[in-house]
């Protein structure tokens, strides 16, 4: 968001001048959404909760692609709001699922594997892949009157990231087999 400050059209907009407020919306959303996890898991089950998270990533990236810190700042705001669902519903719910479904004798190993696959290996592959996309589609525009270099092409990257998240969600919906049993008010 801060990089838009080099573009005269956006330099004095709310989104650029108050980017920290937008970023704080993500933190507030994450704090609130973590409280929703028990309800959503009980009501919809792990498969639907994980799909909701994956679709939230699609929307988050799509909102970034469509938004800007000027007239499209509301799309940035929506992106920040869905972050809590995207992050918490995937990471926290996934961890709770692993904890619930594994035998106590291998639970810590299963949790370690889940963390390594999502935040270790998965994050590394994701970062390298995202960098390849960025290197391909983001480019520098001629310097502005103030002498600042401005970059462009981010919209394409965000659309690619959204499409990738959508493909992952579709594959998860097809291949993840788990039958959720809705419990009554007494937890039975």
List PLM regions with ranges:
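Loop-to-transmembrane helix entry
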Residues: 7-31, 74-75, 155-156
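Helix-to-loop junctions at the C-terminal end of transmembrane segments
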Residues: 32-46, 134
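C-terminal ends and interior cores of transmembrane alpha-helices
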Residues: 56-69
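Hydrophobic core of transmembrane alpha-helices in multi-pass small-molecule transporters
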Residues: 74-89
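A membrane-interface helix-boundary motif in multi-pass transporters
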Residues: 132-165
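Multi-pass alpha-helical transporter architecture, strongest
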Residues: 154-188
């Amino acid at each position: 968001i801060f990089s838009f400050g080099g573009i005269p059209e956006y330099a004095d907009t709310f989104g650029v001048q108050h980017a920290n407020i937008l970023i704080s919306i993500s933190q507030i959303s994450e704090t609130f959404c973590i409280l929703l996890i028990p309800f959503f898991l009980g009501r919809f089950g792990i498969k639907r909760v994980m799909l909701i998270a994956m679709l939230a990533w699609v929307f988050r990236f799509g909102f970034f692609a469509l938004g800007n810190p000027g007239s499209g700042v509301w799309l940035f705001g929506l992106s920040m709001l869905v972050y809590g669902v995207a992050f918490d519903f995937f990471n926290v719910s996934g961890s709770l699922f692993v904890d619930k479904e594994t035998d106590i004798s291998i639970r810590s190993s299963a949790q370690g594997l889940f963390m390594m696959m999502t935040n270790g290996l998965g994050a590394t592959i994701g970062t390298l892949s995202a960098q390849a996309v960025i290197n391909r589609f983001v480019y520098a525009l001629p310097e502005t009157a103030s002498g600042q270099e401005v970059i462009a092409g981010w919209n394409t990257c965000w659309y690619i990231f959204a499409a990738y998240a959508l493909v992952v969600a579709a594959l998860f919906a097809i291949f993840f087999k788990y039958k959720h049993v809705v419990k009554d008010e007494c937890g039975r």
